[in-house]
Amino acid sequence: MEKIIKESKQGESLVLENKPENTKKLFIESYGCAMNFSDSEVVASILSDGGYNTTSVLEEADLVLVNTCSIRDKAEQTIRKRLEKYNAVKRTNPKMKVGVLGCMAERLKSQFLEEEKIVDLVVGPDAYKDLPNLLAEVEEGRDAINVILSKEETYGDISPVRLMSNGITALVSITRGCDNMCTFCVVPFTRGRERSREPQSIMAEIQDLWNKGFKEITLLGQNVDSYLWYGGGLKKDFVNASEMQKATAVDFEQLLEMVAAGFPKMRIRFSTSNPQDMHESILHVIAKYPNICKHIHLPVQSGSNRILKEMNRLHSREEYMALIDKIRAIVPDASISQDMIAGFPTETEEDHQDTLSLMEYVKYNFGYMYSYSERPGTLAGRKMKDDVEEATKARRLQEIVDLQQKHAWFRSEEFVGKTVEVLVEKVSKKSKDEFSGRNSQSITVVFPKENYKIGDFVNVKITSCTSGTLKGEALGLSSMN
């Protein structure tokens, strides 16, 4: 499971610089994980070349697309409500076309197109280059569908437009799909098997971002640490690669060092990591380069060995704790965040207490916590009874959230009195006189604007904090400028 992008970003319409020669209008919304938001940038780029300018006004759109998430039932219900809204607008504008992209497209294709007849086209995550052809089908009065999962597609040849309108931070996709087959997760079924993008196309995209003034990139994938380029194809087929392909293959450690060394004045983040793929050699690269951010998102899902086995997680509690110890030893200033699921099938009170005790051991900086939501098509959905009562799930989730809040306070207070480097990203929501940005550990920092500007790297002395935000005074520009 990849962490859901900030709630404030959910459903945000993507608006880009318009081309004067384009005559059609595209309204596109994104929900779910960062990969969906990155994919929407690819889609907007493809359709910009096809004559579409973006709009934030739903009612004036010729084409409405929603990039969807299937990770939890709540996400699907939110998107269904949006589809109802689109169709209400469509009744007054029959020429408007409505399409579903992403993970729900693959899972509910027949239901959307044939049974409910609420959309005109359904396009899976690997079929976005086919959008112009599919739209031509729709213009001819036919429904259009392409949800074929690819063994090769990485969109490495598409130059994405940028969702992050601050012009400072950007997402760079490096892998697609996942091979892990966790029993609760739909990603392998909706996004296909794991494959990696050619390193030079990644470097070229980052160079383009640097030339445009971007200051920070996030290397993105469902499982970035398992990145492996050996000339193309699925990761699982690497065993059949030639000796030359194996000798010249590039793994995540090498890619991360390549990016950090190639762009020393650009901040590098990455997400998401799976514990079994976070090798010690990667930690040494993180420690070696000051421009690699000292934050590791390390989903664990449960602290119980029995539940981890039921989830088909490829690590034990003890292996996870040993990895935490390595991180603390090699990258002592790293922040660590988590994903946690409360109420997985058969979870007992003892299992839940194991989760809480693991949290006490790690004391995460922040986390993404959910109650279990049965997803059709997953192994858990097919084979396991959702037998934990909703009230019990809610109570256990609240205990996890409360403990995380306690640890977040503890970790925030560790920064008070210290000086941190902050990349200014925007004006603070709470005060127009303050800037907001993040430090290397991905913690939000606010400080008075003074004469600084968005895009500056500023040294800030932390004077106070809340559980989620650090507050301080600027000391001057950092050496990253």
Q: Which residues fall in each region the model found?
A:
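Generic beta-strand/beta-sheet core signal
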Residues: E29, L101, L220-Q222, S271-S273, ...
